[in-house]
Amino acid sequence: MTDSNNWYIEHFERTGSAIGYRITGKLDEVQSPFQKIEIFRTTDWGNLMTIDGAIMLTSKDNFFYHEMISHPVLFTHAAPKRVVIIGGGDCGTLREVLKHKGVESVTQCDIDEQVTVMARKHFPELCDSNDDARAELLFDDGVAYMANCPAGSVDVVIVDSTDPVGPGEGLFNKAFYASCFKALKDDGILVQQSESPLMQLELINEMRTEMGKAGFGSFKTLPFPQPCYPTGWWSVTLARKGESSFDFRQADSAAKTFETLYYTAALHTGVLVTPPFVQAALK
């Protein structure tokens, strides 16, 4: 919500906290069949996107999330060639995945085309790989897409979803994870944004439990900073179909030729060390 002093403030009842940005005005808004998308100009954080009032990203800090949902999983897989992104309509994750030249094809399936339309207009830097020949952008139900995905056809599934409410609700249960499990090859990996490890460990445990019911045998939750999300600390959770190790191709990561603003091989090594309070709470 905006107040009379030109601040956009989102209150988080479940964490008893709030995040605010000083704004100079609203740049755009659209009511899609699924949700309301708004774009604001801030004084210090670039453009701000909200969906149904919830802060999604800013120009200044989205790289933390997009890099950490993409590069750790792709360097953990031995040779990822076929990638599916469920959600991801702002296209920042797609851009990061396509930095990996060994990836041969990426299908992104987001239910709401208007998210991508607004991203192209107001976050063009996130969409500069949308026309890559390896990319396929679909605007459809991600749950249905994964249910119909051929068995054993995918190396990595990235679930770049909103919170588990509204359009994103169906992406956090056993049935959806079972579809991902079926679609993945024997050495395939699923990764999904998994909320704040400081305040939402119960949700992370629920996700891991549902993933386990779907057949996944090992999990790793990686925390990272994300200033625009509740608590400023976020996470992604990886689930392996086959082997249990989350070792990564450290030499390849260290020798990467593309630019990142946060992710490095050294950082990847460090983030594999789970903080004691998180480890104690995880099942």
Swiss-Prot record:
EC identifiers of the protein: 2.5.1.16
Keyword Transport: no
Keyword Cytoplasm: yes
Biological pathway: Amine and polyamine biosynthesis; spermidine biosynthesis; spermidine from putrescine: step 1/1
Enzyme class, first EC level, given as a word: transferase
Protein residues bound to spermidine: H66, D90, D160, S161, T162, D163
CDD domains: AdoMet_MTases
Residues annotated as the enzyme's active site: D160
Residues of the signal peptide: none
Catalytic activity annotation: S-adenosyl 3-(methylsulfanyl)propylamine + putrescine = S-methyl-5'-thioadenosine + spermidine + H(+)
Cross-referenced PROSITE patterns: PABS_1, PABS_2
Molecular function per GO: spermidine synthase activity
GO cellular component: cytosol
Keywords: Cytoplasm, Polyamine biosynthesis, Spermidine biosynthesis, Transferase
GO biological process, one term: spermidine biosynthetic process
Locations listed in the record: Cytoplasm
Amino-acid positions noted as binding S-methyl-5'-thioadenosine in the UniProt annotation, renumbered to this chain: Q35, D110, D141, G142, P167
Annotated ranges, domain PABS: 5-241
Family: Belongs to the spermidine/spermine synthase family.
Subunit structure: Homodimer or homotetramer.
Role played: Catalyzes the irreversible transfer of a propylamine group from the amino donor S-adenosylmethioninamine (decarboxy-AdoMet) to putrescine (1,4-diaminobutane) to yield spermidine.
PANTHER family for the chain: SPERMIDINE SYNTHASE (PTHR11558:SF11), SPERMIDINE/SPERMINE SYNTHASE (PTHR11558)
Protein name: Polyamine aminopropyltransferase
Natural source organism: Stenotrophomonas maltophilia (strain R551-3)
Record lineage: Bacteria, Pseudomonadati, Pseudomonadota, Gammaproteobacteria, Lysobacterales
